[in-house]
Amino acid sequence: MSSNGFINNNVERIIKKFDSRDPFDICAGMGIRIRYKDLGTALKAYYFYQSRIKNIVINARSSRAVRRMLCAHELGHAVLHGELAAMRGFQEIELFDMSIPTEYEANMFAAELIISDEDLMELLNEQDKSFFSIAKELSVPAELLDFKFRIMNNKGLCIESPYTAQADFLKKDIPCCFNCTMQ
C-alpha cells in the first residue's frame, strides 16, 4: 500500500506541473482519455490501460460535481496504480471498496487533489462552520472531506471528523446535494 506521504508527494508534483487541481485539466495534460458512457446504476467509473493509452470511463448518468470526484479518484488509480492496471487489465472488483488498499489510496488521492489545505484551514477557522457546511462550500461529499481530515491528521494537524466515511460511499448513489450549483 502506498504511504500517505507518497500519495501527497504525487499530488503536489502533479498540481505544480499542471498548475491546476482540476482532474479533467490534469488528465488532458497527461494524455489520459476521458469517456462518458451509460454504465447503468452499478458502476460509477473505472480506469484502464490499453494499447499504451490510459483511459477513464465515467458514468454519463453522474452529475458534473460527482464526475469531478470520480475523475479525481480514477486519476489516482492512473498515477498510483498504473503499472498494476497495465499488468492485469480491468477486472471487475468491488470498486471503491475500502478493504482493497488501492481504493483507499485512490480516495486519499482524490481528497488531496480536490481540497487544498489552505482552503480547508480557512473554512475551519471561520466561526459557525459545520463539517457539512464546509463540505458543501468545497463542493464535495462529506465522505471526501473525512478523507481530507485523515490526511491533515497525518500531516500533524489534529482535526477530528464528526463523520466517518462508509467503506462503499462511492459505490452508492451520490446525490448532488453537497452543492447543487455544480450540476
Residue ranges and their predicted role:
Residues M1-Q183:
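Active-site hotspot residues in diverse enzymes, especially metal/ion-binding acidic/histidine motifs
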